[in-house]
Amino acid sequence: MSSRFLAALLCALVCRALHADPIAAGPGTFECPNGTEPITVFTYKPPTYKDGPVLVVFHGVGRNVEDYRNFAITLAERFGVIVVTPLFDKDRFPSSRYQRGGLLDPNGKTQASAAWTYAVIPKIVAHVRGLEAKPKLPYYMIGHSAGGQFLVRLAAFMPGEAVRIVAANPGSHLFPDRVQQFGYGFGGLPDELSNDDVIRRYLAAPLTIYLGTADNTPEHSFDASPAGMVQGPHRLARGRACFAAAQTLAKERGWAFNWRTVETPGIGHEAAFMFAAQEAGDALFGK
């Protein structure tokens, strides 16, 4: 998807929404147009909201989107942000289209970028900007578990305008190499999606790997496949290993490296606790 096309799309979506009412204070929902697949989005706007950014929240494999919206209320109140949490239901968005972003079709062929699930996110952001009549409203993203997997791969292929992308406790990572097959690495992808320029841009993306130090057991729909186990025995180890590999590669090549890693002590594979932790603010808004 070219930057010119994306800019035109965002402008059109913002203009369409300009005459709609702004997001109401408290919890709510809206439907975001998306061709034949409209997306239901759960929201929370603090009653004291002024002009803070948007926080797009991504649910886990359980698709419990309303819970995730509620988990993020503490972040909304603490930082004065509008929370928007899209539902990627299992029927329309199985793991190939959610955790792996729809990069490949059911036959393993690369799809056009407009068909990627990542391409839905700019539409949601544009819709919110239109509702709020703030076409330059900045946005941040955070996802836990399967939502974290979605975001690490989004960071590689379509980071958009996100100020910061926070992947919390993902079960597998996209390592910056062509040895591991996609979605564990860039192996098997065509050159235009796996060459050094792609990996260089990935390492320059504003990605935070946010880990609970007690997420160190193979539980909660853990990826115990051979490809997964290459990355480490548990989520904590995998996150640390991916960050170290990325940092080392960037240093060796002299590339920009904008990743961060943040750990919160004593928390396991629990989105509610990860979002409520003091370190969540550092993961999102720290420098």
What are these regions (language model features)?
Residues 1-7:
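Bacterial N-terminal signal peptides that target proteins for export
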Residues 7-16:
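Bacterial N-terminal signal peptides
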Residues 59-63:
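Active-site glycine-rich loops that stabilize anionic/oxyanionic intermediates
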Residues 89-115, 221-222:
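Cap/lid segment of the alpha/beta-hydrolase catalytic domain
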Residues 105-132:
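Alpha/beta-hydrolase active-site loop
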Residues 164-248:
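The feature captures the conserved acid-bearing segment of alpha/beta-hydrolase catalytic domains
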Residues 223, 243-287:
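C-terminal catalytic histidine-bearing segment of alpha/beta-hydrolase fold enzymes
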